[in-house]
Design a protein with these regions (language model features):
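Conserved alpha-helical scaffold segments that buttress catalytic/binding sites
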Residues: 2-319
Length: 319
């Protein structure tokens, strides 16, 4: 029997400034039976107590959802029709502890254990980049070590920040130490700016990561690069983590730690669309800080990139 697939609420059914502010105005579901019926789900993690400069990413999930009213169900560029083949909903936010980072990390891992237990592929609205560590911890229990496509201005491989081992800049150092990643299947794209030492990006390379600095991406299409990325990370489950500061602040000023000389919005779409065919088992879009962009454009960009992630999930049909 065909599944009853949830559909976004369209702008001709309800004005875009009305309706319930879920992602794409999809149904909000929470009961165990409803969760069991989902293939993928949008979930918010409104955390910003792991940031080292600007706060405000706690408001990211809410504003990304608000801007997502502009997104329509069919991808006219790629032909992807995610709502024709996947059952997708918004399952709300993780109730983090906003006063205790380590407790928040524990709660996130526990909640993703539950989400993955329902067979749901999570599309996460951040929140700062600390959240990816507990998500990867939960994912390892279900999928084992995973490959990673990581877009960011920063490598996030600090050993510590002010003596703390858990923060938004230590995520992938901890992930390596905890054996969460298949290091020969990891690519970091968009790294740039200055370092505290001349070797700051080399730690990643020494682990087996492919590091693509932003300068290698300037003035060109990234479609050829993504062919190489698919070759590098394919052959197993892959997680996609996209820090909005990977994009130049001319397009994405609303973020925690902006760096000039970044990727364009077009390159961002090329990267995500270039993940088509990979065995994606989860994605996140992190570090949107709405208070630093009153136009809403950074949140709108985040919403569109999450939609593009949905469009490249396994099982999505094309029209």
């Amino acid at each position: 029997m065909d599944k009853n697939l949830h559909q976004p609420l369209g702008g001709n059914e309800m004005p875009r400034f009305g309706g319930i502010a879920t992602m794409m105005r999809l149904p909000h579901v929470q009961s165990p039976a409803e969760l069991d019926a989902l293939d993928a789900a949008f979930v918010g993690v409104p955390l910003d107590i792991g940031t080292s400069l600007r706060s405000g990413t706690r408001f990211g999930p809410r504003e990304i959802r608000a801007e997502s009213v502009m997104i329509r169900p069919y991808n006219m560029a790629t032909g992807a029709a995610p709502f024709d083949s996947l059952n997708v909903a918004d399952i709300g936010d993780v109730a983090i502890n906003t006063f205790n980072l380590l407790e928040a990390v524990r709660i996130i891992e526990q909640e993703y254990d539950r989400i993955l237990g329902h067979g749901i592929l999570p599309l996460t609205l951040g929140g700062d980049h600390t959240i990816t560590l507990p998500i990867l911890r939960a994912i390892k229990k279900k999928h084992g070590k995973v490959g990673l496509v990581h877009i960011d201005a920063h490598a996030d491989v600090n050993d510590h920040m002010f003596g703390e081992k858990i923060a938004h800049g230590t995520t992938f150092r901890r992930a390596v130490e905890e054996d969460l990643l298949d290091c020969d299947r990891v690519v970091q794209i968009g790294l740039r700016a200055q370092g505290y030492t001349a070797e700051d990006f080399n730690w990643s390379r020494k682990q087996g990561f492919r590091v693509v600095q932003a300068e290698e991406c300037w003035h060109k299409s990234l479609e050829p690069l993504m062919a190489e990325v698919r070759e590098k990370v394919g052959g197993g489950p892959v997680y996609l983590s996209f820090d909005i500061d990977g994009i130049d602040p001319a397009w994405a000023p609303g973020t925690s730690t902006p760096e000039i000389g970044g990727l364009t919005t077009i390159q961002a779409m090329e990267i995500i669309r270039g993940c088509q065919g990979l065995d994606l088992i989860g994605c996140d879009l992190v570090e949107v800080s709405p208070p630093y962009d009153t136009t809403g454009n950074t949140s709108l960009l985040g919403a569109n990139l999450l939609y593009e992630m949905l469009c490249v999930l396994p099982g999505v049909v094309r029209r």
